Amino acid sequence: MRKIVIAGNWKMFKTQAESQEFLKEFLPALEETPQEREVLLCVPFTDLAILSQSLHGSLVQLGAQNVHWAENGAYTGEISGPMLTEIGVRYVIVGHSERRQFFGETDETVNLRLQAAQKYGLTPILCVGETKQQRDSGETESLIVSQLDKDLINVDQTNLVIAYEPIWAIGTGDTCETTEANRVIGLIRSQLKNSDVPIQYGGSVKPNNIDEIMAQPEIDGVLVGGASLEAASFARIVNYL
């Protein structure tokens, strides 16, 4: 049976003080959340240590937003797997479209980060997806297959989550039709050696569409951006019907 993974990606939002205020409202709202749902918060590096303490013993797992492929070294601005696992981080987002778009991430560096994450005991969340131009040109399927082929070289598919994030739906308010998201996620699954890899949908996920999204048979969770920044909003998503 495939695992359900509901992840909030805070991106570059929330100071330590703001993260603590969030938890005061968020954690009590999870008292009746089914235990089999894996809930995680992928937060800025500055929030990781304090949230590791605050989330201890709760249902919520801690995630980071990036990891370098080296154990240590002269890589200014980067962070290593051992640094993350030491403070209780369990998951890490790899290859998010914003990293690819703004910071020069390539399929080759994504692959190195995926391997490093697993080497140091982290579960990576690999993000794949197409732009509006690529979708309009009919390139969605070929692009995603290419990303998977390059990104997953020597990656253990028993310790992996994949997020399908159509780039044109991220932060735009435009949500991919749920049946279309389900179709593309089915395509992703057909390319994998392990059909039990949890595959999430990401892109303008909100309380008013989560139930429809999670009713799709191929979708195993969501990667939530803006709607994860507000406690009541993210709690409603976690507690989908």
Swiss-Prot record:
Q: Does the keyword Cytoplasm apply?
A: yes
Pathway of action: Carbohydrate biosynthesis; gluconeogenesis; Carbohydrate degradation; glycolysis; D-glyceraldehyde 3-phosphate from glycerone phosphate: step 1/1
In Gene Ontology terms, what is a biological process of this protein?
A: gluconeogenesis
Keywords attached to this Swiss-Prot or TrEMBL record, sorted alphabetically, are: Cytoplasm, Gluconeogenesis, Glycolysis, Isomerase
Q: Name the enzyme group at the top EC level.
A: isomerase
What catalytic activity does the UniProt entry give for this protein?
D-glyceraldehyde 3-phosphate = dihydroxyacetone phosphate
- Places the protein is found: Cytoplasm
The GO terms describing molecular function are:
triose-phosphate isomerase activity
**InterPro entries per the record?**
Aldolase_TIM, TIM_sf, TrioseP_Isoase_bac/euk, Triosephosphate_isomerase, Triosephosphate_isomerase_AS
Q: Which residues are recorded as binding substrate?
A: N9, W10, K11, G171, S204, G225, G226
Q: What is its EC number?
A: 5.3.1.1
What are the catalytic residues? Answer: H96 (electrophile), E165 (proton acceptor)
- Give any Gene Ontology cellular component: cytosol
The record describes the protein's role as: Involved in the gluconeogenesis. Catalyzes stereospecifically the conversion of dihydroxyacetone phosphate (DHAP) to D-glyceraldehyde-3-phosphate (G3P).
Q: Which PANTHER family match?
A: TRIOSEPHOSPHATE ISOMERASE
Family (UniProt) = Belongs to the triosephosphate isomerase family.
Q: How does it assemble?
A: Homodimer.
* Full protein name: Triosephosphate isomerase
Source organism: Nostoc sp. (strain PCC 7120 / SAG 25.82 / UTEX 2576)
